[in-house]
Amino acid sequence: MQIELEKILNQNREKIAFGNLPTYIPELTRANKDALGIYISQLDGSEFKAGDYDYKFTIQSISKVITLIMALEDWGAEYIFECVGKEPTGDAFNSMMKLEIVRPSKPFNPMINAGAIAVTSKIKGKSPEERIQRIMDFFKLVTGNPDLKVNESIYMSEKSTGDRNRAMAYFMKDVGVITGDVEENLDLYFKQCSIEVTCKDIARIGLFLSSDGVLLETGKQIINPKHSKIAKALMTTCGMYNASGEFAINVGIPAKSGVGGGIMAVVPGKMGIGVIGPSLDEKGNSIAGVGVLEQLSKMLELSIF
């Protein structure tokens, strides 16, 4: 497997030049555009890695999967989906167009920014400090990495430039989708997106979902399996933004991307996969990372369809 992974990475490196680093979060322009790596964690305990698998990046929108599960655990699916929909939009991840023109005025799904902000606003806690601590503790539990932390420079960069997210949040507050203090909820959202990870960390999140919420180390079921299935279904239909349909056809596994260049993928009952490639395509997905997953899926026949 090791040789095959190295070969797949090398065959996709040429795509890096055709992508770009995101510019709307200034700190993300400091990323190494040429980085490309993969980490695979399997339910039988075996692990495979290649390339820049230890490269550190911020989790960004991949965090939306975890906060969705937390909100579902806190409130149950019926209430959460009164506040956010389940359908793909076909629009860019940061688009606010349908939020205003479609009734009822709620975000289409939890994987776009508006939906994720609404979901994060539902995470329970008596104070902002308790809420971010709950998020960090759950991330550490699922990844098995007690050293996870927020990248402060990315967090401050996102907070200072997040005007579009701020506009969406205040609109959702106005129509009753978001409860509580808008700036407090946005601050929580910016922090969750700025958690620094490696391919191994997001592969472990994928592994957790592949077992429907069982921790590999303990064999303990720590979430409702139904909530894991909901997350994977939404990853399949909405996780790669407005390229989700194409990804489902070409790769065929649940996945969630982030503008930090990461992609977290799940092969149900088998493995979790973490890929990093900061150079993004026009949809906001890792341009080489998508190619790597497509080749890997074909080689190992991973498609769930």
UniProtKB/Swiss-Prot annotation:
Entry's Gene Ontology BP terms: glutamate biosynthetic process; glutamine catabolic process
EC number, as in UniProt: 3.5.1.2
Gene3D superfamilies: DD-peptidase/beta-lactamase superfamily (3.40.710.10)
SUPFAM superfamilies for this protein: beta-lactamase/transpeptidase-like (SSF56601)
Taxonomic superkingdom: Bacteria
Stated name of the protein: Glutaminase
InterPro entries attached to this UniProt entry: Beta-lactam/transpept-like, Glutaminase
Catalysed transformations (reactions): L-glutamine + H2O = L-glutamate + NH4(+)
UniProt keyword Transcription regulation, yes or no: no
Keyword entries, A-Z: Hydrolase
Summary of subunit composition and partner proteins: Homotetramer.
Record GO terms (molecular function): glutaminase activity
Family membership noted in the UniProt record: Belongs to the glutaminase family.
Annotated substrate binding sites: 61, 113, 158, 165, 189, 241, 259
Manganese as UniProt keyword: no
Pfam families, A to Z: Glutaminase
